[in-house]
Each structure stands twice: as C-alpha cells, then as structure tokens.
Regions:
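Catalytic alpha/beta core of large soluble enzyme barrels
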Residues: 48-49, 61-68, 73-198
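Internal maturation/activation junctions in enzymes
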Residues: 2-78, 86, 156-157, 188-189
Length: 198
C-alpha cells in the first residue's frame, strides 16, 4: 500500500526517475537553445536540491549544456482535473480518473442515487477508475452486487486498493511527503485527511 515501506520505496524511486528525466530534458533543451540567462553553473550546482536529487548523469548533462529552466518540478492541485484523465485502457473500455495529487485516492467508491418521478429511487456504487478496473479485470462485479447496498465492498478488494487517503496515519503521511519533497523543487499541493477525533 501507499504507506508501506515498499510503497514509500516505489514513490521515491519513481520521483527520482521523473525528476532526473525532467532535468535532463531541460539540459538537452539548453544545449539546443541555450541556457537560462540567469543560469550560473558554480552557484547552481551548489544548491542542496541539485546535490541530493540529481544523479551523476543528469549533473553531467547540466555541466555540458547548462539548464534551460531554473525550476522544473511541482505537484499542482488536481482535485477535479484528476477525474478527466484517462488512467487505464483495457480493450474497448476506458477508465477515467487518477489520484488527485501525492495522496492515494480519497475513497474506493461513493454511492449515487437516481431520482425518479415514480418514487423508486435507486442507489448504486460508483467506483474510482482504478478500483473499477480491478473489479472488471478480476470479474468481481457479481460478488459486489451480492453484497447489496450496505455490504462491505472493501472486504473483497486487496488491501493495497483500500488504503485510501483517510486511512493513512497523518504523521506517516507527512513523512512520505517529506520524502517526495526531496525530488520537487517547487511546491506540492497536498491534502492531509485527519480523523474526526484530532
């Protein structure tokens, strides 16, 4: 899950890769179009972020070409926007929606109600696209339907899918964001969900 040791290692490894790729792209662009006018190699390379986040290959590319962009990495707020992104495609079916930032998904599902003029309103579950893709891939819809409206859907899902944002310990969440920040040179938009008794 997101807050497991393995999850944290994957987060760090992924961000290190993305950050180095972004900085290498900026350095390659500097080789083509010239570095930023305020770029100063000596001072730039002394920056703690550059020293810690970038690998030797990226630093070498910057040394050769300079850097086109002074700051590159940010995790912007994407709450509503995250619901319009194609996250997964399986055959002819598209799954729309991703996590809204550095947090895991907010919930595995929510309940919607259909309005009817005949007073036969119906309730149904709407699953996050990642969860729906899993349900479809492993043919779990009939099991979910058997649970009914009040059934515990999460009981048939793997634990890693049910580690939603409100289940993450707030202190652990801050620790994880600290590890993420190591590879981000601008800001991180983040929501930390706290239990009601805080």
């Amino acid at each position: 899950g997101y807050d497991s040791e393995e999850g944290t290692e994957i987060i760090e490894k992924t961000l290190k890769f993305i950050t180095n790729a972004a900085y290498q792209a900026s350095a390659t662009l500097a080789g083509e179009k010239g570095p930023s006018p305020i770029y100063d190699y000596e001072n730039y390379m002394k920056c703690p972020f550059i020293e810690e986040a970038l690998n030797d290959q990226t630093k070498q590319t910057i040394a050769e070409n300079g850097i086109r962009n002074i700051a590159i990495m940010s995790i912007a707020p994407t709450g509503s926007i995250s619901n319009i992104v194609l996250s997964y495609k399986n055959g002819n079916k598209n799954y729309i929606g991703v996590s809204g930032g550095v947090e895991p998904i907010f919930a595995t599902h929510y309940t919607r109600r259909t309005e009817s003029f005949k007073d036969d309103n119906r309730f149904y579950k709407v699953f996050h696209s990642t969860v729906q893709a899993y349900i479809d891939q492993y043919d779990l819809q009939s099991k979910i339907d058997e649970l009914g409206e009040e059934g515990d859907v999460e009981s048939i899902l793997p634990e890693f899918l049910t580690r939603t944002s409100h289940k993450i310990d707030s202190r652990r969440r801050v620790d994880i964001q600290g590890k993420i920040q190591k590879y981000i040179d601008h800001s991180i938009s983040s929501t930390i969900n706290l239990p009601e008794d805080v």
